[in-house]
């Protein structure tokens, strides 16, 4: 009888173990069963155009520890750190560049090792681990809540991420493996999160969150803007003439851009620029906001007002309000 009970207990424990791991590996699929993959694709393209990293993975794919370290160090531009000549990293299950990158990340506390000489690069990184790594890498610890003895509770990392806006639109999955869809959204939010600055006065250093100082501005010399596309290489809604090949106008400002954006004229967009260079642009227009007028139906344009014939053959007028760009 005892053997039967023992065998049943072992079977139950094994079942629970595999069930938990199956949920951990595939649980993210439930999160994204109704998700908008367009946003994920847009964010992946954004990071590629900014030259940060290329996350060529399905939205529901889970992130390994090695991939997380590589993406995080690229995000904060620490991936160019090289090991001294002849120095081999301590992890036996890694070699080459990945070995030193992992050792650097562990030394900074961005991720933990499993043992002194084992990193387990192919294991999944957990949501809480990823959040902690991002928060530490962005330098938030000086302004985080601490315990009475000065230590930082594990819960403070999630609290800081929430405070900084890194959790905006993110489904928090706690101790489960993080998916690419969730990780990319965390990185996207972290791009424009305000960073920590400090001032020295009276022999004392005070740390504070500095508005306007972000990863995007400080590390990539770029800026996120919003506007309306006023022209592409085919159409100019103000009648100022067509733009040049591979060109686009946003708020009537011309940008040379190698990609084709033929369907954005008149739409609200978010875009990223570095100096005068357009890095990436995408529509944030809602479908119900569209008024589509075929060019063949336009009868005239004067004083910022279009005269056109609608689908019922009636003459209509549509004005572009003053100050609307």
Model-identified regions with their sequence ranges:
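Beta-strand/loop nucleic-acid-binding surfaces
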Residues: 251-262, 315-325
């Amino acid at each position: 009888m005892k053997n039967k009970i023992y065998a049943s207990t072992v079977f139950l424990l094994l079942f629970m173990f595999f069930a938990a791991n199956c949920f951990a590996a595939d649980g993210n699929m439930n999160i994204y069963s109704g998700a908008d993959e367009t946003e994920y694709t847009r964010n992946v393209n954004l990071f590629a155009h900014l030259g940060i990293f290329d996350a060529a993975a399905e939205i529901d794919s889970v992130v390994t520890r090695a991939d997380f370290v590589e993406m995080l160090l690229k995000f904060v531009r620490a991936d160019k750190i090289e090991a001294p000549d002849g120095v081999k990293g301590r992890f036996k299950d890694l070699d080459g560049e990945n070995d030193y990158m992992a050792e650097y990340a562990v030394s900074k506390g961005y991720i933990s090792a499993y043992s002194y000489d084992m990193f387990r690069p192919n294991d999944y990184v957990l949501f809480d681990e990823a959040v902690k790594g991002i928060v530490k890498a962005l330098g938030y610890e000086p302004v985080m809540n601490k315990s009475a003895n000065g230590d930082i509770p594990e819960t403070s990392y999630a609290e800081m991420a929430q405070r900084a806006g890194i959790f905006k639109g993110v489904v928090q999955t706690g101790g489960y493996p993080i998916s690419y869809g969730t990780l990319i959204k965390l990185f996207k939010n972290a791009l424009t999160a305000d960073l920590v600055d400090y001032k020295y006065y009276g022999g004392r250093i005070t740390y504070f969150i500095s508005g306007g100082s972000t990863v995007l501005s400080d590390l990539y010399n770029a800026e996120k803007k919003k506007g309306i596309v006023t022209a592409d290489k085919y159409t100019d809604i103000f009648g100022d003439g067509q733009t040049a090949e591979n060109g686009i106008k946003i708020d009537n400002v011309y940008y040379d851009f190698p990609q084709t954006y033929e369907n954005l004229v008149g739409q609200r967009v978010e875009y990223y620029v570095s100096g005068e260079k357009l890095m990436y642009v995408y529509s944030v227009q809602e479908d119900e906001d569209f008024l589509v007028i075929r060019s063949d139906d336009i009868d005239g344009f004067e004083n910022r007002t279009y005269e056109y014939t609608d689908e019922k053959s009636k003459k209509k007028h549509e004005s572009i309000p003053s100050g609307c760009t």
